[in-house]
UniProtKB/Swiss-Prot annotation:
A GO molecular function held by the record: urocanate hydratase activity
Protein name: Urocanate hydratase
The keyword Disulfide bond belongs to this UniProt entry's keyword annotation: no
Cofactor(s) this protein cannot do without: NAD(+)
Keyword terms, alphabetized: Cytoplasm, Histidine metabolism, Lyase, NAD
Enzyme Commission code(s) on record: 4.2.1.49
UniProt source species: Saccharopolyspora erythraea (strain ATCC 11635 / DSM 40517 / JCM 4748 / NBRC 13426 / NCIMB 8594 / NRRL 2338)
UniProt cross-references to HAMAP family, sorted A to Z: HutU
Cellular compartments annotated: Cytoplasm
Gene that this sequence comes from: hutU
UniProt: NAD(+) binding residues: 48-49, 126, 172-174, 192, 197, 238-239, 259-263, 268-269, 317, 487
């Protein structure tokens, strides 16, 4: 029986596999489980409560064995974290195809998933955990930064200086919140139930400090707000208790949101349950635990609505908190909007989304070189240039050095081609992988998040992520994934991802141009079809072929 052990991706140019097309997924799988990156690496959990990179350690070892011997005309099939076959394909085909957590409609729920998981037949892949392109908290940082920047522009004159944001959750995703707020010059007070998570965010530079208690947290946050000084502080506690208390005390919040792991009730700590009892209670009495968690979420959301009634800008960050509170009987759960329809959809209409790349060399200098290349290509975009400079100054790498940068249709392929040239010339010490979050413009169906409130009512249509996976497979991506339930939980989302290697070859250049054109192109097409004028303009201006578009 294979057992847990520390995992770390190789660095440098010495290959373990037969080519960079197979070395790349091998290193990124291992990187997902690097102790600097993963939330619970011994359990193969990368982020998001239970999002895993492989089904079990035996499956992990089998995947590694197959990747080290895979040829460039073969494709490895991975079913919910377990390798199930190797097929002869061709050099343009993906080297790996992954399907994670997918269940047929009537069976797409947590109890059925947990039954199958207990039998060893499935795993929960989240979005980038099971697709091997998680880069640590930076992976969600720019999306969170862009959201707060949009709030600042719409409500606070373009800056969060002099504002207080109250939120909760400092896990792999939520940990980006305090830095995203301070990058926008604001103050963040974050509630987190697990002290280890909070101190980890301090260690990685995403959080300024952890307060000794609620009184100190309020005092320091309000002082920084009065001084218009960027600052972030965490308080250890349960959000369902702390947010109502902050409201009761009359703390004036300007913005309120949340990134606890509410997508799975077993990943949300109920009121009255001690941290050390959490895992045992959830595993032994999941139904009772779920009911208590939902009751706590209802109190949490009720407090958020209370802040909204008091004048705060309140939005959901796509973790199903509202839906779970509604299931508990709270009638005003959907009184505040999700972040995508409120702030992000205009970017999706331009094919923009969380494009990212990682340096297989392991050398931070390679990412610094790509930052300079991005500024050279897109330096006229002041907003993007500011992000790249801030990221270079403030973001600590976890595992292999990486960068996230929201680029749109007509931009991603230019970056990919430039990076490939830099590998070929030796300016970069080793190849890069170029991928993205599944939370993208044309790769997800998620009525509680990315596709909430679509103009034509098409929120739940799931053809789009399927088409996206097929398009990327046909375009030359190195590995392609199709998942269910990421971000918002079982029965609530379908989503696809791609990763493509830039190894400096002419073949890689051809693949990169196609994938990094067609992938964001799906976002433009999706939003044209839904009736968005901005998407129609982008399609017309940039030559995206949409039948019937004048």
């Amino acid at each position: 029986m294979s057992s847990a052990r520390p995992v770390r991706a190789a660095r440098g140019t010495t290959l373990t596999a037969r080519s960079w097309s197979t070395e790349a997924p091998l290193r990124m799988l291992q990187n997902n489980l690097d102790p600097e990156v993963a939330e619970r690496p011994d359990d193969l959990v990368v982020y998001g409560g239970t999002g895993k990179a492989a089904r079990n350690w035996a499956s992990f070892d089998a995947i590694v064995r197959e990747l080290t011997t895979l040829s460039d005309d073969e494709t490895l099939l991975v079913q919910s974290g377990k390798p199930v076959g190797v097929l002869r394909t061709h050099e343009w085909a993906p080297r790996v195809l992954l399907a994670n957590s997918n269940l047929v409609g009537d069976w797409a729920n947590w109890p059925e998933f947990r039954r199958l998981d207990a039998l060893g037949l499935m795993m929960y892949g989240q979005m980038t955990a099971g697709s091997w392109i998680y880069i640590g908290t930076q992976g969600i940082l720019q999306g969170t930064y862009e959201t707060f920047a949009a709030v600042a522009e719409r409500r606070f004159g373009g800056t969060l200086a002099g504002t207080l944001t109250i939120t909760a959750g400092l896990g792999g995703m939520g940990g980006a919140q305090p830095l995203a707020v301070t990058m926008n010059e604001g103050v963040a007070l974050v509630v987190e139930c697990d002290p280890e998570r909070a101190h980890r965010r301090v260690k990685h530079g995403y959080l300024d400090e952890v307060a000794d208690g609620l009184d100190q947290a309020i005092e320091k946050a309000e002082a920084a707000k009065a001084q218009r000084r960027a600052y972030s502080v965490a308080v250890i506690g349960n959000a369902a208790e702390v947010l109502p208390e902050l409201l009761r005390r009359g703390v004036r919040a300007d913005i309120v949101t949340d990134q606890t792991s509410a997508h799975d009730p077993l990943s949300y700590l109920p009121l009255g349950v001690e941290l050390e009892d959490w895992e045992d209670y959830a595993s032994k009495k999941p139904e009772e635990f779920t009911d208590r968690a939902r009751d706590s979420m209802a109190k949490h959301v009720e407090a958020m609505v209370g802040f909204m009634d008091a004048g705060a800008e309140v939005f959901d960050y796509g973790n199903s908190l509202r839906g779970e509170a509604q299931l508990a009987g709270y009638g005003r759960a959907f009184d505040y909007p999700g972040f995508v329809p409120a702030y992000i959809r205009p970017l999706f209409c331009e094919g923009k989304g969380p494009f990212r790349w990682a340096a297989l060399s392991g050398d931070p200098a390679d990412i610094a070189a790509t930052d300079r290349a991005i500024l050279d290509l897109f330096g006229d975009d002041d907003h993007l240039a500011r992000w790249i400079r801030l990221a270079g100054e403030k973001v600590s790498f976890q595992g292999l050095p990486a960068r996230i940068c929201w680029l749109g249709y007509g931009e991603r392929h230019l970056a990919g081609l430039r990076f490939n040239e830099m590998v070929a010339s030796g300016e970069l010490k080793a190849p890069l992988v170029l991928g993205r979050d599944h939370l993208d413009c044309g790769s997800v169906a998620s009525p509680y998040r990315e596709t909430e409130g679509m103009a034509d009512g098409s929120d739940a249509i799931a053809d789009w992520p399927l088409l996206n996976a097929l398009v990327n497979t046909a375009s030359g991506a190195t590995w392609v994934s199709l998942h269910h339930g990421g971000g918002v939980g079982m029965g609530r989302s379908l989503h696809a991802g791609q990763v493509t290697v830039a190894d400096g070859t002419a073949l890689a250049a051809q693949k990169l141009e196609r994938v990094l054109t067609n992938d964001p192109g799906m976002g433009v097409i999706r939003h044209v079809d839904a009736g968005y004028d901005r998407a129609r303009e982008v399609a017309t201006e940039r030559g995206v072929r949409v039948p019937g578009l004048a």
